[in-house]
Structure formats: structure tokens, C-alpha cells
Amino acid sequence: MPMGAAERGAGPQSSAAPWAGSEKAAKRGPSKSWYPRAAASDVTCPTGGDGADPKPGPFGGGLALGPAPRGTMNNNFCRALVDRRPLGPPSCMQLGVMPPPRQAPLPPAEPLGNVPFLLYPGPAEPPYYDAYAGVFPYVPFPGAFGVYEYPFEPAFIQKRNERERQRVKCVNEGYARLRGHLPGALAEKRLSKVETLRAAIRYIKYLQELLSSAPDGSTPPASRGLPGTGPCPAPPATPRPDRPGDGEARAPSSLVPESSESSCFSPSPFLESEESWH
């Protein structure tokens, strides 16, 4: 059936009209009013298998949207959103955050060789002490494992204890020698250190008075004697030695008092103050 000119002109125009609008929209491209500018770090998603270049999408220039049917969502677009979603909770920062620094390792422990080894065993029974005496002959045990002679203590403690033992030993030896110079009864009696010093002071005073009262060899006065005695008889006159160190004046043992506490010594204020202590 022949068609009119109007119909021939309208037919192709009506069939091409729908495609004309889509071509104009494709040439116009996306509107720049609401699309953000693409950043260099935006996630890009490859298009479909056709290998076409990615096209700018609504989430940046790097986000590609492949051709998809109208009214549907592109799978690549969904995958890009999943890749951009943070893996941790919102309160955590995962991008650009360095891991916390590791704690510095602890300094190495001091070797056991530098640590002093202190051993203080308790008291042991005599059978155990006899058994260990043969095993440890180099350890001087003062008693049944009472207190060690510090074989395992530091050197400065051992030296300090040794000095203290030497000091006590010297003091005891000095008092023993002083008791030996006292008259017989006092030398044989067990005296304390204070009693030994007081008896030595009284004896020295007696010797000084004995020498000062008879400078020319005459007899000393009979009214004075050693403490605790009455008037002492005059000792036999003996010639004085040429040198004062050649002889030693000693009182007879019968004149020595029985007790060192009782004294009727010379009226020295020093001795009177000592006697007032009792």
C-alpha cells in the first residue's frame, strides 16, 4: 500500500526519536553539579569483560560504572562499596596508623656468680654434726651448726668480724696482764674489768706514796697501808737500786685485802669519788 509523503517522513522520524535522546544524553555526560571530583586514592573497579575504559561515576572519577540495564545496579559498583567499607569498628583507625611500639626488652639478669650466697642452717643434732665434721673439714663450726664462721658471706663482712675478734682478744689479753701485776690475792681472784682497773689504780697510788714518803731510804709511815688493812708493819729497809727500773716495790701478800671493794686508801679526791660509787 503506497504511503504518503507525510507518513514516509513521520515513520523514520518516529522510530529514531527514542534513540536520539539517549545519544544526546551520552554526549552530554554526567552533570558536574553533584558529582565529586575524583581523588588519586579512589578505588577503581574494572568494567565488564569488554575491556572498555572506566567511566566516571557518582562516587568519583576513579569509580567505574560499567554498562548495565536500566533500573539495575552494577555488580562492580557493589564490589567497590564493599572494598571501601572499613573492616574494624568505627572507633578504630586503620588507615595510616602505625602499630604500637613494642616494649623494650628487660635488661638481662645479673649472673648468679656475682650474687653472694648466704647460708644459715639451723641447729643440728650431735650425730649430724659429727657426720658433717668429716665432710666439711675446712668450715670451723663453733657449735652444733649454730652460727657459721661466715664462710659464704661477702669479704667485707668477714674482714669486719675478724677485726672485731682481734680487738676483743687484745683487750682480754691486756686485762690478763694487768691482773698479773696486782698483788697475789688480787691476781688469783677472778675480777671483772671494772674491778681490775680500780684495784690497779689503788695499787699504783700505794706505790707512789711508798716512794714519796721515804726518799732517803727511811721507813714509810706505819699508819698507811693497802686498802682494807690496819697499820702495816714497816718493811725491812732495803737499799734502793741505782736505776728506778732495776727493782719493783711490791707489797707483801699478807697486806693485800680479801675484797677489792673495801678500801681505806690515800685521801686522793679521785679515789674518794670512786669509793662513793658503791
UniProtKB/Swiss-Prot annotation:
GO molecular function term, any single one: protein dimerization activity
Pfam families documented for this protein: HLH
Keywords, alphabetical: DNA-binding, Nucleus, Transcription, Transcription regulation
Residue ranges of the region described as Disordered: 1-66, 214-278
An annotated GO BP: regulation of transcription by RNA polymerase II
Compositionally biased spans, kind Low complexity: 252-271
Disulphide-bonded residues: none
Compositional bias segments (type: Basic and acidic residues): 240-249
Residue ranges of domain bHLH in the record: 155-207
Broad class of where this protein is predominantly found: nucleus
Name this protein carries in UniProt: Achaete-scute homolog 5
Organism, as annotated: Homo sapiens
Name of the gene this protein is made from: ASCL5
